[in-house]
Amino acid sequence: MASDRAETQRRRRQRREQVRALSWRPLMRGSLVERLRRCGRANCACAEDPRRRHGGKFLTVQLDGRTHALHVRPEDEGKVRSAIAAYTQLWKLINELTACELSDLQREARERRRARRRRR
């Protein structure tokens, strides 16, 4: 039991340290998607052939119950991808911290039950 507690505390310290390191990076929740569209010019190849449509990257984010889309220029794509990846990593770390807290609560409940049984 003591080793379980020590292991959980070690994992918790590691995850908190990783969260601190991530907090300095840009974080963004959202998705980067590519939309293929026709440009509207009658002479363009995209008007005839759907495979030749024009592409563009868009960041989609849901805020306050509404979905927002923003065009992302090619030179900004790397920065946006990095911010999304950092947010995803942060979310995983928070889930792992939640698992540590849950493990502690479960262990404490088991210990209380055992202590009550011994008193009887």
Protein language model regions, located:
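A positively charged, amphipathic N-terminal helix/segment that binds anionic biomolecules
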Residues: 1-120
